Amino acid sequence: MTYNALSTSSAAGALGFIDFMTSPERYRHWRLGFEGEVAELIMQVDENAGLFEGYQLKLNSYDLGVDIELADALQRLRFEHPEVKVVVLKSGRDKMFCAGANIRMLAGATHAHKVNFCKFTNETRNGIEDSSENSGQKFLCAVRGRGGLCAYRLRA
């Protein structure tokens, strides 16, 4: 089964579709590691791997591509690794956690893309809460640096 979505970004150009299927070996922005009942989910965004052209993902800022990988990792943690009791989210960058949603990506996006980006981002965060409440996986965010006002809202 393939999951694709018609792109609603003016920056998408010839891309046309956004592929929501990914796996840990394809991640460009996250690293996932395990040690017993503890998993580490490390955010280290590839600045030059934005979903569309026209912007860089500086300072661990995120776009839909970053969130697609996060959503995939969260589902895998929940359903493929029920032995995990604690997930530690942290940055792979020194002195910077996350700058928030990428402003240049948002500036180049259509209204529909912005709305769907926000919906997907919110549902991904809701998945963290649901995992904590219903699967027994607790999430900790280890911040060693700056996080922008609009940085990941990890409400775990």
Name each model-derived stretch.
Residues 2-88:
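Conserved CoA-thioester-binding segment of acyl-CoA-metabolizing enzymes
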Residues 29, 81, 111-113, 151, ...:
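Histidine (H) residue identity feature
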Residues 36-44, 63-112, 122-142:
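A structural preference for short, pocket-lining loop segments at secondary-structure junctions
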Residues 51, 99, 151:
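Short acidic, gly/pro-rich beta-turn/loop elements at beta-sheet edges
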Residues 53-56, 102, 154-155:
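Surface-exposed beta-strand edges and their flanking turn/coil or helix-capping segments
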Residues 114-118:
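A glycine-rich helix N-cap at a beta->alpha junction
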Residues 141-154:
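Gly/Ser-rich catalytic serine loop of serine hydrolases
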